[in-house]
Amino acid sequence: MLLAHISDTHFRSQNHKLYGFIDVNAGNADVVSQLNGLRERPDAVVVSGDIVNCGRPEEYQVARQVLGALRYPLLLIPGNHDDKACFLEYLRPLCPQLGSDPQNMRYAIDDFATRLLFIDSSLAGHAKGWLTDNTVAWLEAQLSDAGDKPTAVFMHHPPLPLGNAQMDPIACENGHRLLALVERFPSLVRIFCGHNHNLTMTQYRQATIATLPATVHQVPYCHEDTRPYYDMSPPSCLMHRQVGEQWVSYQHSLAHYAGPWLYDEHISCPTDERRSPC
């Protein structure tokens, strides 16, 4: 299994920029082009929420056009910037697993050695996250049915504070209910989130929990400063690879850079250079 995982695309309407100066639509189109050009082709691309910025139909039209150019299956979940009804109307053609109920978007992918569960943690009208009773019950049933099969959950909001002064107040408010399932089910070993616009990792019992960078603009990690900073540090995504029982996640840069070059030991330490005595 190989998954490319991006997050927080924050598409805007045609010819509109984020915050008046960030061309997220062009940036995301470039990300799609880079993913389509990967030398090792993923089985699917995950987008973990905040697909658009303002929840408007015009934004979803752009998102569907740009994301629809990906040459891989899409696995989508909404975030707090998304409008549930518009999200489903415009993006279900790209991800049929979303179903038909905007209030109950969740699904399981059982095609790989690890089971993948996708849930909606968004709460309409709020930046913070919330897990509904139906979502928690569904997760419990899925984990019970899967037995010992390793399971990864994908959601938008992290289920616990991560020491980020700006983002912790708008994490998943009742994420403890998911952590309780981690305690009950040893098979729940990974939780991947968006929302925080930076790569942050922690461990809870047997579960590795991570938030992803965004595709365009980032939020710096500050432990004490609560002011709402953002910046244009280089974007990246995560690649999730599983071979046998081993799952490896690694960061893949989405910035433009020189290379790659093949390593050549003959030019690393050229033989014609005189080595000075120590």
From Swiss-Prot:
One GO process term, biological-process aspect: glycerol metabolic process
Single annotated GO MF: 3',5'-cyclic-AMP phosphodiesterase activity
Family matches, as Pfam families: Metallophos (PF00149)
InterPro entries: Calcineurin-like_PHP_ApaH (IPR004843), CNP_phosphodiesterase-III (IPR050884), GpdQ/CpdA-like (IPR026575), GpdQ_beta-strand (IPR042281), GpdQ_catalytic (IPR042283), Metallo-depent_PP-like (IPR029052)
Positions annotated to bind Fe cation 1: D8, H10, D50, H197
SUPFAM superfamilies tied to this protein: Metallo-dependent phosphatases
Required cofactor names: Fe(2+)
Catalytic activity entry: a sn-glycero-3-phosphodiester + H2O = an alcohol + sn-glycerol 3-phosphate + H(+); sn-glycero-3-phosphoethanolamine + H2O = ethanolamine + sn-glycerol 3-phosphate + H(+)
EC number: 3.1.4.46
EC top class, as a word: hydrolase
Keyword terms of this UniProt record: Glycerol metabolism, Hydrolase, Iron, Metal-binding
Annotated residues for binding of Fe cation 2: D50, N80, H156, H195
Function: Catalyzes the hydrolysis of the 3'-5' phosphodiester bond of glycerophosphodiesters such as glycerophosphorylethanolamine (GPE), a typical phospholipid metabolite.
Membership in a protein family: Belongs to the cyclic nucleotide phosphodiesterase class-III family.
Protein name: Glycerophosphodiester phosphodiesterase GpdQ
Protein's organism: Enterobacter lignolyticus (strain SCF1)
Gene: gpdQ
